[in-house]
Every structure is written in C-alpha cells, then in structure tokens.
C-alpha cells in the first residue's frame, strides 16, 4: 500500500506516494550533500554535514521539535529549520509504518543558531492550522543512583561505577546534612555521552543489580538547565551548599561580609544550603572566589552563582518528576520549598506524568479551564468512555486500567505509624483481586506520607509502574525518545506485565522510608469509591 501525505509546501491537498516521498528525500540529499541513514527508530540527516572537521557542536546547540504532522518529512522540514542557521544533524523519529512519530531533534553548529531557531520557529505554522513547538533539547548524560551505603566516599563510588558501566566521567556526591563524614545515600553519575548513560541505565535498571550488597535505585537525573549568559551577568545572588544544619543565617552573613563589610544584603538558609544576596554583582563575584572551599562551623562549603529559575520550566520539571543535582538551587531561588532528590522533600504539586524516562523531554500538554456558559449543552458520559490521557491522577489511571482489563476495582488498605517527632505517617497497600494469586499479591511503596491524598496517589503510582503501564499511551505529546515500543494488545485490553521497579522521586508531600525501624500500626480499609483524590 502506498504511503500518502498532503504536501505542505503550498497547503494544497496534493497526494504523495511512498515513491514520491523517497524521490523527494533523494533530491534533498543531492541538493545539500548531506547523508541520510535510518537506525534505532530514527532517521538521521547529516551528523556531520559535508566538509565538517573537528568534534560535534557542544551542548546547547540542539533543539527539540514537537507537534510535527505525521506525514511531513525532511524535504519539508529541513528548509524551514535552515532559516535559523547551518544544521549539523537533523534526527526525525520514525514509526515502523513509515510515518514520523511527531517529533524531531535539530542540532545546529552554534548555540546562537539554536536560540534563534527557538525564537523564530516556536509556534510556527508549518501547515495551515498546524503549529510546531520548538524548545531547547537537554542531552542528558547523568544518572541518579540511589540506596548507596552512606559510608562510601566519592572515590569508592567512582571506582565501582567504572567497573560496572562504561564511559563514566565523574560522580557527584553530597555529604549528609547532619554528618559530613557520610554521604546522603545517593549520587549522580556523569557519562561521556547520552548513549553511554542510556546503556548504563539499561544495565542497572532491572532492580536486581547490587553494589556493595545493596540493591540500588537507578533513574535519569534531570540535566541542569542552562541559563543564557546575558541573564547570568545580572545575577548577584550566591548559592552556598554543604553548610552545617546548626549554622545560622547571622553566621553566614558575618562570614561573607568579612571580605567587604556591608556587602551582603540578606541571607536565606534552608537546611544545609543558603542563598546570599548582595547589593551589587561585583561584590557577589568577588565573594564567590574568596569563599568557595572555605570552612564555616567546620564544614567546607561550595559557592556558585545562583541560577535564576524559569517558572514555566520549574513547573514542567515538577510535573515530569525529574531529579536534578542542583534542584535545590532552581526551586528555592523561586521561593519554593526545599527538594531532596529521591529522599525527603517538599514540592507543591502531585505529578501529572510519572514515566521516569526523560531525555530530552517534549513539552507537556497544557492543562486549561474554559468558560462554562449558561445554556451549554451537556451530555452524560462514563469516565471509562474517555481516553487515558484525560486523567492526571494515578488513582484514576489505576481504576481505568483495571476496568479496561475487565478486572475488579483495586482495593486500598491504609496503614499508619508514628514518627519519632510524633507525626502520623500513612501508607497504602493495594490489592488487585484479578492478579492477587499471581506473581505479585499486593503492591506497597516503601515511602510513608503525611497526608492521605499523597499516600493514596503514591501507592497508585507505584502499582501502575509495577504493572508497566504507560500513563499517556494515546498522547503523541507524551512520547519520549528513549521510551521502548509499547506492548501490543487488543483494543479493549491494556497489556499487563509485572516487573520489579526502582521508582523515581515523586513530587509529593514529605515522605519517609518504611525502612526506618518503625512498626506499621493501625489498619483501615478504605473503599475504592471514596473521593480522596
């Protein structure tokens, strides 16, 4: 059967066959001199371009392109993106059917060209009524490694990771807030390339891999967001980490004022890090060079310029559930509460998307409200007649999942315990009767929550991820470049496989691990029909 598409060069309904598509691509290659090859579900145009000498362009030169019409190909797309500058490589994600997957990555030869592409082509009308989205692509080269023995030093972790994975460049380890001789139980491992990081993740992700006798947790770390040089030139706030919990704001202000009395405007400290605000940038830069590596109350501190946060990107980061080695910096500088990757943390929202595979991330679907006018015609429907991308709550997704598989609704069992400081902590156990006698009799996360809503949401997230359920399987905007091909199944039944899972850090209210010696106490059965979400 011939492939057909509408020619977007003039907006007419001009039908092109597969042979014509092939001819158009060959003509593009002949005209530009670029090579084209298809591998691993993507078609690469260039990389490098003709006559290129030297290494590939640095990070920050690539953009992500979303919402591409599925029947549009390089012969139409490349000329559009060449308007911003010289293309080093154009990667179009492809389906087995021959259609594209709705998104692509364009690498330019300079960062300036990439920024220009974002400015002039984001929300560009590529065809009548069809607008593409263009944003920076973050080439993720870092993995989060959790459940590391706290007594291990950076050198030991680096040596061990080099033994079990290839391409390790560095390891980032932060000391404990309460005991500087120990680490925080996690580390960030940086690899020489995204491919090396992806291969390492594939090797370590099953949940059975152990280091020093401990089963480790592995996930993508959110790469640190790059802030343009013009913005950074205006920053007059320093980010100070590795402070003692007992160190006061007054002590920090006094120490940073030593090199120039009166230079510090104010200090905001949260746990073991702080933001030091200066009256002018010159004093901030001078203080950074003087104070970095200095000791305050016996702790050697790290001092850098604070990165101003992009509120939209931070919100998107919360929705994605991504973890960043500098997340404290980005979130708190925007007057948010503190975040601790994969451990105790406070973030303002529950996640809308829980797939931990983010590298790079397409733009999220915007959640909107619309005016409800008097007289608007309404039609009663069942929630089960909707598609899964209409839901954001994991509790709703789990109920939907069970219904689509003709299973009985999930059963939620609530447990509680009391923390050392007297707080009531909650956790749900979920039983799915249809598979209770199978390989997994129940699902229960190893984190405790302080609110009922968070406990129920976390348990549902954990269960869905164990069931290998993709939250946005029907939404083209949710496709991730590193996601595996979805399991096939009948239209009425969602595919099910049970698998071990080291789940990512969830932006929930503060959670506490079950592995803290506490005894689970009171049990309460909550009907699945109760509206706790």
Curated annotation (Swiss-Prot):
User: Can you list the GO cellular component terms from the UniProt entry?
Assistant: cytoplasm; nucleus
Which regions span the lipid bilayer? Answer: none
Q: Subcellular localization, per the record?
A: Cytoplasm
The UniProt entry lists the main location of this chain as: cytoplasm
- Residues annotated as domain RRM: 61-139, 141-223, 236-308
Q: Which cysteines are joined by disulfide bonds?
A: none
State the superkingdom: Eukaryota
What's the short name of a Pfam family annotated to this entry?
A: DND1_DSRM
Q: Which UniProt keywords apply?
A: Cytoplasm, Differentiation, Meiosis, Oogenesis, Repeat, RNA-binding, Spermatogenesis
Mind listing the GO biological process terms from this record?
cell cycle switching, mitotic to meiotic cell cycle; female meiotic nuclear division; male meiotic nuclear division; mRNA stabilization; oogenesis; spermatid differentiation; spermatogenesis; trophectodermal cell differentiation
Assembly and partners? Interacts with YTHDC2, MEIOC, MOV10, CNOT6L, DDX4, UPF1 and PABPC1.
The record's function comment reads: Essential for male and female fertility, playing a crucial role in regulating germ cell development by ensuring the proper progression of meiosis prophase I. Regulates mitotic-to-meiotic transition in spermatogenesis by forming a complex with MEIOC and YTHDC2 which recognizes and down-regulates mitotic transcripts for a successful meiotic entry. Required for normal synaptonemal complex formation during meiosis, binding meiotic cohesin subunit mRNAs containing GCCUAU/GUUCGA motifs in their 3'UTRs regions and positively regulating their translation.
Q: What name does this protein carry? A: Probable RNA-binding protein 46
Recall the taxonomic lineage recorded for the source organism: Eukaryota, Metazoa, Chordata, Craniata, Vertebrata
């Amino acid at each position: 059967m011939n492939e057909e598409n509408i020619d977007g060069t003039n907006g007419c309904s001009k039908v092109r066959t597969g042979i014509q598509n092939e001819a158009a691509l060959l003509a593009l290659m002949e005209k530009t001199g670029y090579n084209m090859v298809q591998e691993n579900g993507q078609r690469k145009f260039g990389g490098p371009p003709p006559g290129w000498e030297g290494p590939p362009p640095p990070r920050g030169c690539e953009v992500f392109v979303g919402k591409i019409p599925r029947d549009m190909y390089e012969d139409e797309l490349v000329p559009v993106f060449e308007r911003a500058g010289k293309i080093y490589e154009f990667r179009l994600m492809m389906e087995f059917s021959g259609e594209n997957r709705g998104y692509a990555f364009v690498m330019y030869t300079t960062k300036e060209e990439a920024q220009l592409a974002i400015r002039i082509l984001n929300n560009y009308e590529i065809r009548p009524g069809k607008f593409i989205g263009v944003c920076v692509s973050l080439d993720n080269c870092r993995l989060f490694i959790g459940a590391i023995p706290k007594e291990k030093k950076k050198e030991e972790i680096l040596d061990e990771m080099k033994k079990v994975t290839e391409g390790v460049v560095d390891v980032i380890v932060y000391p404990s807030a309460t005991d500087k001789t120990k680490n925080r139980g996690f580390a960030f491992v940086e690899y020489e390339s995204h491919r090396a990081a992806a291969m390492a993740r594939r090797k370590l992700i099953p949940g059975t891999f152990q280091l020093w006798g401990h089963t480790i947790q592995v996930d993508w770390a959110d790469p640190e967001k790059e802030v343009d040089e013009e913005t950074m030139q205006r920053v007059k706030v320093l980010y100070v980490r590795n402070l003692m919990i007992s160190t006061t704001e007054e002590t920090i202000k006094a120490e940073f004022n030593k090199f120039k009395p009166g230079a510090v405007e104010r200090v905001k400290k949260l746990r073991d890090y702080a933001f030091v605000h200066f009256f002018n940038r010159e004093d901030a830069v001078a203080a950074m060079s003087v104070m970095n590596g200095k000791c305050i109350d016996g702790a050697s501190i790290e001092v850098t310029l604070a990165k101003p946060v992009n509120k939209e990107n931070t919100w998107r980061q919360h929705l994605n559930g991504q973890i960043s080695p500098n997340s404290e910096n980005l979130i708190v500088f925007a007057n948010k509460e503190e975040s601790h990757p994969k451990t105790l943390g406070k973030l303002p929202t529950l996640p809308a998307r829980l797939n931990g595979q983010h590298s790079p991330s397409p733009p999220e679907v915007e959640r909107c409200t619309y005016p409800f006018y008097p007289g608007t015609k309404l039609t009663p429907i069942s929630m089960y007649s909707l598609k899964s991308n209409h839901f954001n709550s994991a509790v709703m997704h789990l109920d939907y999942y069970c219904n689509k598989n003709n299973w009985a609704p999930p059963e939620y069992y609530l447990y509680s315990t009391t923390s050392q400081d007297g707080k009531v902590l909650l956790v749900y156990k979920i039983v799915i009767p249809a598979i209770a006698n199978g390989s997994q009799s129940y699902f229960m996360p190893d984190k405790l929550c302080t609110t009922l809503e968070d406990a129920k949401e976390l348990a549902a997230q954990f269960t869905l991820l164990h069931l290998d359920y993709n939250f946005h399987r029907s939404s083209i905007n949710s496709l991730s470049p590193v996601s595996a091909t979805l399991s096939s199944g009948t239209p009425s039944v969602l595919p099910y496989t049970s698998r071990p899972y080291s789940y990512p850090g969830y932006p929930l209210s503060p959670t506490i691990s079950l592995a803290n010696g506490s005894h689970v106490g009171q049990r309460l059965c909550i009907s699945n029909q109760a509206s706790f979400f």
